[in-house]
Amino acid sequence: PEQPFKTLSAVNALTLNPGDRVLLARGCVFENQYLHLRARGTKEAPVAVESYGEGALPHIKASGTGLWYQNYGQPLDNPNHVWHGYVSSAVLLYDCEYIRLRDLEISNDPGLLPGERYNQGDKMNRTGVAVVAQNRGTLHGITLTGLYVHDVKGNVYDKHLANGGIYCVCQKPEQENGEIARYEDLHITRCRVERCSR
């Protein structure tokens, strides 16, 4: 665009194509915002989401926003294990490939609501970054580098749903005859993860 976007919701509405770059200004804090992308680059021209300028890393501060629905498609081996439900993610890469996230600060801590406890059983599931493969078979070339992910307070009981600092998962395809979801060339480098719980 000729003018910079003021919110991440404008970025979420885009279809990102090979070679596209989303540049977030250093020193900016995206309060109560999230970045949920469905982007497909190529090996020669990956999609890039990264910082520019000088100063502190751009901070995506979800604070409990960015809800999406995780569903494994069938009950798990233990009836006590939760296999579907809502998750709050500051950054969600859903069926993305050939994409690079670099030099971002990410957090997702809304604080405790009145009457809520840290270890409450029905507490919201939360991630800093969630990478989900489901309906496109093998996803290639996903790189997370130089991320500072911190203060993500998820549900300490729902171990099968997305919870924690950086969470990558393959789910059952929605189509019965869909190709099995998997990753190839998924790289997580130089990332710092602090004060995160599942």
Predicted segments with their positions:
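Acidic Gly/Asp/Thr-rich repetitive segments characteristic of extracellular carbohydrate-active
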Residues: 1-25, 29-31
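Soluble non-cytosolic domains of exported or imported proteins
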Residues: 2-5, 95, 138
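Short linear motifs in intrinsically disordered
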Residues: 11-12, 36-40
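Extracellular/periplasmic catalytic domains that process cell-envelope and extracellular macromolecules
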Residues: 15-17, 40-43, 53, 136-138
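The right-handed parallel beta-helix/beta-solenoid scaffold, focusing on the short coil/turn
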Residues: 20, 33, 45-47, 89, ...
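Right-handed parallel beta-helix/beta-spiral solenoid domain characteristic of secreted/periplasmic
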Residues: 23-30, 38-118, 151-157
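Extracellular beta-strand/beta-solenoid scaffold signature
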Residues: 34-37, 67-92, 115-135, 157-183, ...
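Right-handed parallel beta-helix
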Residues: 46, 50-55, 97-108, 137-153, ...
